[in-house]
Amino acid sequence: MSSDDTVKQEHSCSADSEKQDSSCASDNEQPKEPQSPRNIHGLLWVVTILAIYSSTFLFALDNTIVANIQPAIISSLNGIEKLAWSGVAFVMASSATVLTWLQIFNQFNIKWMYIFSIAVFMGGSAICGAAQSMDMLIGGRVICGIGGVGQYVGVMNFLPRLTTMQERPMYVSAMGLTWGAGTVLGPIIGGAFTDSSAGWRWSFYINLVVGGLFAPVYIFLLPSLEPQPAGTTVSSRLKRMDLVGTLILFAAFAAGVIGINFAGAMYPWSEPGIIVAITLGGVLFIVFGIQQTYCILTTEETRLFPVELVSWRQPLLSLLFVCGCCTGVCVTVPTYVIPLYFQFTEGDESLQSGVRLLPFVCLLVFSCVSGGYLAGRLGYYIPWYIMGGGFCLIGSALMYTIKPSSGPGATYGYSSLIGLGSGMYLQLGHAVAQAKVKPEKVPAAVAFTTTAQLNGLTFALVLSQCVFVNEAAKRIGWILPHEPRSTIVDAISGTGSTFVQELPTATQNEVLGAIVTAIDRTYILCIVAAAVTLLATLGMKWERLFIEAAAAA
């Protein structure tokens, strides 16, 4: 054997030995925890995440804070014909601008756009608190809705960048806890301010206090995240935004919501203006869909809606969108109508009627936190949609049977089932969608699931008010055929409650029964939403998504 062959053999043996040692070493090593993507830890991280969640809480709070304080607002500002807009203006503005905010956060510095959205929200809150007319209040609510949803999208952009894949379901569910808690605590907090010496204006001023408290955290602790390469000009960033789609979508929401909101309450359904508004809204939504699908005056990269996530071959994201809309419905309807039920049947004041939501709130918060934690630990997501949809369906069907004589216990128990079910998948879709897409598509997934939830909330509020007002007015009209419709609408809106109290006892009981029946009808929306959720699970897979995604990462 030559010296060269000897060297080669020794080298080969040495290499084999190294490989064997390396293999043994790797077998003995424990799997490493995923490296944290954030550079703040410990107490500073706790303070930072609390500050982030506080903005989500305030946004959710403003969704429903006017639910049971509208009579006090009307008493101060007048303008009964614009009553419903104190709530609808906020959710309409949020739904119409959520996709635009997503593009803004995808083009500009995330930290400073987040702070800008908070400033817009605080400005709108100041206008609402200082409002001297209903028009001023409605304008402030629109500004609040635009800024509030910007905060929400900002949080959904921060969390994926500051948490690991394994942590994410827990943090997203914790955000769901704050969002759900804010949504259902809105009537309680609003009622507390209204019934106290502070008055209803502090329902809006409180946002300024909380925002000011956490302002140093936003400015000094939040990391500066730049989504675009350094040196990218403002003009080039704006060119990557779909301004045409933004205008079409906002106009579609405005027309559709105006038509549905005013129909029956202010004008008959046959009114030409109502027909035109509803028709125009529908046409504009179709135009928006065509413009986005075929990239008219936009491109595949810059279009507003993430059409690429909608696929027949991989339907999971589309099913998550549907379930997101459904959970928005199941949270919104009880939040608005349970206080209304107790105001009419028990004569509750604003605060007391809001407190009646606590069983619903507690179960929603519990299931949201526990569901998010267990989904992250176990990896499966489909069981939470099945159980959540089932509980919502049972609870909603039982709430449909409520009568004036049912008593508080039945309402507490039945609504708790809805809270338990809706909490199970309230925020789960955000984590699932982000885990199913490539890293560069995470912002689009955020837009997709956030849009679903806000759309469900918006149309649940608009449609439930429409169903309640029209059903109650129709049934009371049968009982009191000689009363003007405007008087009846005022009474069922909460601004003319003395009208009901002054009726003879027998007639009063009939009217009360008609009102409760109208409230029951709103739960048809929840029944349908829960049933659709269960149907959607038929297209989902049993997969350990979060564990697999974390391993791949």
From Swiss-Prot:
Family label: Belongs to the major facilitator superfamily. TCR/Tet family.
Basic and acidic residues composition bias: residue spans: 1-21
Superkingdom assignment: Eukaryota
General function of this protein: Efflux pump; part of the gene cluster that mediates the biosynthesis of asperlin, a polyketide showing anti-inflammatory, antitumor and antibiotic activities. Is probably involved in the efflux of asperlin.
Induction: Expression is controlled by the asperlin biosynthesis cluster-specific transcription factor alnR.
Residues annotated as transmembrane: 40-60, 85-105, 110-130, 136-156, 174-194, 202-222, 243-263, 270-290, 319-339, 355-375, 382-402, 413-433, 522-542
Protein name: Efflux pump alnA
Gene field: alnE
